[in-house]
């Protein structure tokens, strides 16, 4: 095909126009042939020269390659011109020996220049992380010499285009080429604005490259503008700019043509041809990860925005749509950053091993390098990058470190530092990961600081034995109880508040620390006396005291109103589970709008206050007193006469529009004469306060619910027994010894349970979890590592079950009943004496959960600046990852609501209670920090009163459903993802 183009050169001037038409026609035919070859997966590149016109045809990749190599085109044009001149001269005169010798020298120097240029292209491509040659932007490098540095050139030889070197210099460079290398400090992105020589683009090429951009990214690069006089240099420069775009993607997982195609999508030709400097700068900021912007962990919402150029859309709808569709791929990003961190980690370990002359795997003591920067440091890191763990770097810094890996060197001036601490590091830092290493270190430092504080506190009291420091009292009375000698800008707090840097600073100045106690009597006051002075602080009143007082007040209101409904003069405790189980016969009217009837323990401060303000309107309606008689004290139950229950007009729904007739409740007086009659009227609901509660109550059937949950519990128990038998290699089911699984979780555990569902007795689960377990039964598997212990437990349980049963008295006083409970999700159950052991375990688990919940509440209150326990919004913390970070959790135990934690995990949490710390990284809506509400759009969010007490704090209402232990659930369990 090249011969066809060359054969068109020797033509006469009068035949120029006709020959041009012939050439155009033949080039179109050649283009068609290239398309057919492309269908057979053959790649073709063709350069044709006719007079001053240059034609580039071929397949897509062939054209792209030729257009990126300006030197190929120049060399071919130059070769054709020289050949034509040589042919003319050969016919006119004979070349002399000197001329022949000069010709040989010219060929030799041209060959050497070509060799040097190819080697420069290879080195430049290697610096970009590519295995192919990449054209060197000589003009840009000479204009901006700090962007790319060339090392290894012979002494006295400056870097420039090989055309400017003489024969001796070229030979010298080739002799020393092994030491030549390119170091890219800043990639080139801005396209050139100057046009070079004139190159004519014909209609054949226009038809070959569609302006619509539908032929793919490579075609867009060679698309001409409306001016047919676009130069050869401009076309080549445009392609070279695009080839340099992926400078920071050389470590990407994907490679090959798809990588360049993605980059080509980012730089449409219309911007480069128009010479738009600003648009190119916009692309530079959006398409590259600039090292200065080293966000270690870019959020997913940030990256997709950067993939869309900020300039107005160009006239290429196909490409524009393509760019908008591109979204952040977290999996690809995660795989990429993980791979880069692994490479940098291996690089650091290899360099560190070389520095200490060790063989085999080594562990770098990063804390030592940070605490002894003069004696232990690293040289050769890129400018602006400190030496840290690779897990703290982002992608740009990781790539820059890998580019400079040959220069990196560990400098160890004092080897004794490594030897003296190596044993401590191995003892205190588990090798299972960064998190365990950090946990061990901060735990040790906090314990040291706590011991230091206890010792100094005891010295201030005149004692020689260490005493526990009452940190809350120091915070409550900063003028009378304070600490001197702490490092600058470090307040006195519990050690659990401090991070590693502050803990180390406190230990360094431990000798200067002094506790000042001006009023020792404050340390002996009771809790109520201590909290009294705090009522004048901005918090105004302790939240825990306040909500407890309100709940007690609402409880008294409910008890009094319930007694009035029964015609009694004394307050009677309300059996809340019975009211929920029988909403048609037992309900409450007059509650504030939107507040259902529940135990006061379910309500937060805002709803409790609304109930207290509207207490005069509250009225209990009891249509079937016999339902509640068994829950009344014996003396009270005998005073209620239930004869009025036989009225035929009674069973009307409270929601009907007709009036509900009165029922008479006869109450015997003290002298058992003159009975009193109190009329209880149930008018139609008008304020809609119980609207959200009544429909749910009418739909709820306790009998159906009880039958369903009993059946599900039996199925799950049978499933567990079958899986337990399979684990022992038996065909029959084996009763599961749950106590053994709870006592030895390392040797006996269950795999395959649904996420968020712990292994417990089926009787402790609600309907949602039971159904999830049954749906997941194929994956459930029992792991029994000690069969002999298991068999012993089975035999003991079998022998105990065969013992003669004790005589059970039918009297209700013999059985242990769960009376006095208030929560809606607890029903009254009767537990035989034989199950006392199981009850004690359930009670123990419940106590552990309460202790862990109290611990989390106290720590969360400290984190938001309250200084008192605040209910932890577990669900909001779960659905807003990264907003609240919990430090100090034991290794292997993740932060969850206590109802989702195993007994062993809760015990470990309580053991590490002093080290657990909540940190609010990014507040979520509804969170109160230092009396400031983050977002008041929450329906039950915190309320700040402005009328009576402008500084009194409202804490979000605790309306969330809690799971309870034992056989004590009446309502459907909440979503276990909470």
Curated annotation (Swiss-Prot):
Phosphoserine PTM positions: 19, 103, 207, 210, 214, 391, 496, 647, 653, 701, 763, 803
InterPro entries: GTF2I, GTF2I-like_rpt_sf, TF_II-I
Region of interest (Disordered), residue spans: 208-323, 641-660, 666-693, 795-816, 939-978
Keyword Nucleus: yes
One Gene Ontology term of the molecular function aspect: DNA-binding transcription factor activity
Residues modified to Phosphotyrosine: 248, 377, 482
Domain of life of the organism encoding this protein: Eukaryota
PTM note: Transiently phosphorylated on tyrosine residues by BTK in response to B-cell receptor stimulation. Phosphorylation on Tyr-248 and Tyr-377, and perhaps, on Tyr-482 contributes to BTK-mediated transcriptional activation. Sumoylated.
Residues with Phosphothreonine modification: 535, 537
Location of the motif Nuclear localization signal: 299-306
Chief site of localization: cytoplasm
Glycyl lysine isopeptide (Lys-Gly) (interchain with G-Cter in SUMO2) crosslink location in chain: 35, 86, 92, 94, 130, 140, 185, 219, 221, 305, 322, 332, 359, 414, 429, 435, 467, 473, 505, 540, 639, 643, 649, 659, 694, 795, 807, 841, 844, 859, 871, 971
Quaternary data: Homodimer (Potential). Interacts with SRF and PHOX1. Binds a pyrimidine-rich initiator (Inr) and a recognition site (E-box) for upstream stimulatory factor 1 (USF1). Associates with the PH domain of Bruton's tyrosine kinase (BTK). May be a component of a BHC histone deacetylase complex that contains HDAC1, HDAC2, HMG20B/BRAF35, KDM1A, RCOR1/CoREST, PHF21A/BHC80, ZMYM2, ZNF217, ZMYM3, GSE1 and GTF2I. Interacts with ARID3A. Interacts with isoform beta of PRKG1.
The protein, known as: General transcription factor II-I
Native source species: Bos taurus (Bovine)
């Amino acid at each position: 095909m090249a011969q066809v183009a060359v054969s068109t050169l020797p033509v006469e001037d009068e035949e120029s126009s006709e020959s041009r038409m012939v050439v155009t026609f033949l080039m179109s035919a050649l283009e068609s042939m290239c398309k057919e070859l492309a269908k057979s997966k053959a790649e073709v590149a063709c350069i044709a020269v006719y007079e001053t016109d240059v034609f580039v045809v071929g397949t897509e990749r062939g054209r792209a390659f030729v257009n990126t190599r300006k030197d190929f085109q120049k060399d071919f044009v130059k070769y054709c011109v020289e050949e034509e001149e040589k042919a003319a001269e050969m016919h006119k005169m004979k070349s002399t020996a000197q001329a022949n010798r000069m010709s040989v020298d010219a060929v030799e120097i041209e060959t050497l220049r070509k060799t040097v240029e190819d080697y420069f292209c290879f080195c430049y491509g290697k610096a970009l992380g590519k295995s192919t040659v990449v054209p060197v932007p000589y003009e840009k490098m000479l204009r901006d010499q700090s962007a790319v540095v060339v090392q290894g050139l012979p002494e006295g030889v400056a870097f420039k285009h090989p055309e400017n070197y003489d024969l001796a210099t070229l030979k010298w460079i080739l002799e020393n080429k092994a030491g030549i290398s390119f170091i890219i400090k800043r990639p080139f992105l801005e396209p050139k604005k100057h046009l070079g020589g004139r190159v004519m683009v014909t209609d054949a090429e226009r038809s070959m490259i569609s302006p619509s951009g539908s032929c793919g990214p490579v075609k867009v690069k060679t698309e001409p503008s409306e001016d047919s006089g676009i130069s050869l240099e401009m076309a080549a420069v445009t392609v070279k700019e695009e080839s340099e775009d992926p400078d920071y993607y050389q470590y990407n997982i994907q490679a090959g043509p798809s990588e360049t195609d993605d980059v080509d999508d980012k730089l449409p030709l219309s911007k480069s041809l128009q010479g738009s400097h600003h648009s190119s700068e916009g692309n530079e900021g959006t398409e590259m990860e600039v090292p200065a912007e080293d966000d270690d962990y870019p959020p997913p919402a940030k990256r997709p925005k950067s993939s869309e150029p900020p300039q107005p859309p160009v006239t290429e709808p196909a490409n524009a749509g393509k760019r908008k569709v591109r979204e952040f791929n977290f999996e690809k990003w995660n795989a990429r950053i993980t791979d880069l961190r692994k490479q940098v980690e291996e690089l650091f370990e290899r360099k560190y091993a070389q520095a200490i002359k060790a063989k085999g795997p080594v562990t770098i003591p990063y804390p030592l390098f940070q605490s002894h920067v003069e004696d232990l440091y690293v040289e050769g890191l890129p400018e602006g990058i400190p030496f840290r763990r690779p897990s703290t770097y982002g992608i740009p810094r990781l790539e820059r470190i890998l580019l400079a890996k040959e220069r990196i060197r560990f400098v160890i001036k004092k080897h004794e530092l490594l030897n003296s601490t190596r044993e401590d590091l191995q003892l205190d830092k588990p090798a299972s990961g960064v998190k365990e290493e950090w946990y061990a270190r901060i735990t040790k430092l906090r314990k040291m600081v706590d011991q230091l504080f206890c010792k100094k506190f005891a010295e201030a009291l005149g004692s020689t034995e260490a005493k526990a420091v009452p940190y809350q009292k120091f915070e409550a009375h900063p003028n009378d109880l304070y600490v001197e000698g702490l490092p600058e800008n470090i307040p006195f707090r519990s050690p659990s508040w401090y991070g590693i840097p502050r803990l180390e600073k406190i230990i360094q100045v431990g000798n200067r620390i002094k506790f000042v106690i001006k009023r020792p009597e404050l340390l002996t006051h009771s809790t109520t006396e201590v909290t009294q002075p705090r009522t004048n602080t901005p918090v105004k009143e302790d939240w825990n005291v306040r909500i407890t007082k309100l709940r007690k007040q609402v409880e008294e209101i409910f008890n009094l109103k319930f007694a009035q409904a029964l015609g009694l003069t004394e307050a009677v405790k309300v059996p809340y589970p019975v009211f929920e189980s029988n909403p048609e016969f037992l309900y409450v009217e007059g509650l504030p709008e939107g507040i259902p009837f529940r135990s006061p323990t379910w309500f937060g401060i805002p709803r409790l206050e609304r109930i207290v303000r509207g207490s005069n309107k509250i009225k209990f309606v009891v249509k079937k007193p016999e339902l509640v008689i068994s829950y009344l004290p014996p003396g009270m139950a005998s005073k209620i006469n239930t004869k009025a229950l036989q009225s035929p007009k009674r069973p009307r729904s409270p929601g009907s529009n007709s009036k509900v007739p009165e029922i008479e409740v006869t109450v015997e007086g003290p002298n058992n004469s003159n009975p009193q009659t109190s009329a209880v009227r149930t008018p139609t609901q008008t304020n809609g306060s119980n609207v959200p509660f009544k429909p749910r109550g009418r739909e709820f059937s306790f009998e159906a619910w009880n039958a369903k949950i009993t059946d599900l519990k039996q199925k799950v128990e049978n499933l567990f027994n079958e899986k337990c038998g399979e684990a022992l290699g038996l065909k029959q089911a084996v009763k599961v010894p749950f106590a053994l699984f709870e006592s030895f979780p390392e040797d006996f555990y269950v795999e395959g349970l649904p996420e968020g569902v712990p292994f417990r007795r089926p009787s402790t689960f609600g309907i949602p979890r039971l159904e999830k377990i049954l749906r997941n039964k194929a994956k459930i598997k029992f792991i029994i590592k000690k069969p002999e212990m298991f068999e012993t437990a089975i035999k003991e349980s079998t022998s105990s079950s065969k013992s003669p049963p004790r005589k059970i008295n039918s009297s209700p006083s013999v059985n242990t009943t769960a009376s006095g409970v208030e929560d809606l999700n607890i029903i009254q159950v009767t537990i035989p004496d034989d199950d006392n052991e199981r009850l004690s375990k359930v009670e123990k688990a419940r106590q552990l959960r309460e202790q862990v919940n109290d611990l989390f509440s106290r720590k969360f209150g400290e984190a938001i600046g309250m200084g008192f326990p605040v209910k932890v919004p577990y669900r909001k913390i779960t659905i807003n990852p990264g907003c609240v970070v919990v430090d100090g959790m034991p290794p292997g135990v993740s932060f969850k609501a206590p109802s989702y934690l195993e007994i062993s995990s809760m015990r470990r949490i309580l053991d590490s209670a002093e080290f657990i710390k909540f940190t609010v990284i990014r507040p979520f809506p509804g969170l109160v920090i230092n009396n400031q509400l983050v977002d008041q759009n929450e329906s039950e969010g915190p309320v700040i009163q402005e009328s009576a007490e402008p500084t009194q704090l409202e804490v979000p209402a605790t309306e969330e459903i809690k799971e309870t232990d034992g056989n004590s659930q009446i309502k459907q369990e909440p979503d276990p993802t909470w």
